[in-house]
Amino acid sequence: MFYLLYLLNDDSIVFNIFRYLTFRSFGAGVTAFLISIVLGGVFIRFLTRRQFRENIRDDGPETHKTKAGTPTMGGAFIVIAITFSALLWTNITSEVVWAVILFTLSYALIGFLDDWLKFTRKKGMRAREKFALQIFFALLFVLVLMADIDGFRMALSADKVADYPFTSVVLPFFKKAVINLGWLYLPFAVLAVVGASNGVNLTDGLDGLAIGAIVVAAGTYIVFAYLAGNAEFSKYLQIPYIPEAGELAVFLAAVGGACLGFLWYNSHPAQVFMGDVGSLALGAAIGAVALIVKQEILLIVVGGIFVAEAMSVILQVASFKLTRKRIFRMAPLHHHFELSGWSESKVVIRFWVICLVLALFALSTLKLR
């Protein structure tokens, strides 16, 4: 919205500041943070009155019994803060921005339906139904990207540039390592965004854990989006150049700001949980940006904690079905460490530290080739 003021008055000194991505990213982050803080208190009171409270699993750690009754579905105000701030600070004429916003909202809707059914029917959506909806919206999103984005340009050397189709994947750590998957990119990309969304959902089991990890992931992809949208920087670093990618840095700043506002209420002891409406949407947002800036492979590194949490569940279920034995004390992984004697706060802080280390490692790939 503000960017339009610059376009309509590009000779104005006052509105000229809105053309800078850095300023708009800062504005988006602050705006989303403030909205999240203000709406948080309102939502917590509303959710408490309406009895939208979290049901704690009976077989979970004993320390979690005290969490029973904590209001959930707080992710709704995260999504509202992100959407409003993004519409205010991004270039709303960008089709890529709209695609990411609408995709994020579609996953928020899936999560909202799941959360709502937990209170109206005492059981959420069937896993099969939820997974089918996730795949449907992911397919739609990726097909839109494949139709809308012709491809990307990447410097191979100081004086040589090559064009690649959007269905190409860039391998980190290697120079000039680009593989065109063709139509195989469709299932690959769908797996990436659906996996990211469910990974965040499984990580959301301790106060502040998932939301803190999302802040780190968003911050990391802000850097990638900003660099990918800048012709000079992308050429120097020999990374894909995506003209509209810079606007996604503004969007992710809104994501980070909204998440920090939520963390204000979600830090231990949590006053509210985000529910599926928040976790599914946030994972989808990060995954969507990773696809567009052509850093899909690094999603495994940046979201390493999410991958570990998801894999712990898959391995636990597979092991029990095949051998009737469990690998972990409890899955997802964070519960295993709790039952191993770590306090909840220690698990959260240590997982955050791992997130930061993985983020720095991912950023190092900009130069390590």
Predicted regions and their residues:
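Alpha-helical transmembrane segments
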Residues: 2-44, 80-109, 135-136, 141, ...
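Membrane-interface helix-loop junction between the first two transmembrane segments
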Residues: 38-59
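Membrane-interfacial helix termini and the short, flexible loops that connect transmembrane helices
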Residues: 47, 116-124, 270-271
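Alpha-helical transmembrane segments and immediately membrane-proximal extracytoplasmic
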Residues: 55-72, 95-96, 222, 232-236
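Juxtamembrane helix-capping/reentrant segments at transmembrane boundaries
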Residues: 57-70, 122-130, 134, 334, ...
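Divalent metal-coordination and catalytic microenvironments
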Residues: 74, 115, 276
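Conserved ATP-binding subdomain of kinase catalytic cores across diverse folds
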Residues: 111-113
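Membrane interface segments of multi-pass transport proteins and intramembrane proteases
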Residues: 118-127, 173-178
